[in-house]
Amino acid sequence: MKIAVIMGSNSDYTTMIETCKLLDEFEIPYDKKVVSAHRTPDLLVEFSKNARRNGYSLIIAAAGGAAHLPGMVASMTTLPV
């Protein structure tokens, strides 16, 4: 199982760091990525539609301010978000 931890910007990592620490503690492989629903929508679409093909089983998504990122990702993949 491989998890994608995605956030809207680098500054959101301060929010996601506890998630990453927990995944490390349980030795669950994951990748961290910045995928912005507002600044890089094409990247968001490509990431979401290809996440399963790229080996992800689950996507953890968060962004500061607005919660558009998780909803946008969930609308384009059948993986749990």
Feature annotation, model-predicted:
Residues 12-17, 41-42, 63-72:
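Short glycine/serine/threonine-rich phosphate/pyrophosphate-binding segments
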Residues 1-37:
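Glycine-rich phosphate/diphosphate-binding loop of Rossmann-like nucleotide-binding domains
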Residues 30-52:
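N-terminal beta-loop-helix "entrance" segment that forms/cooperates
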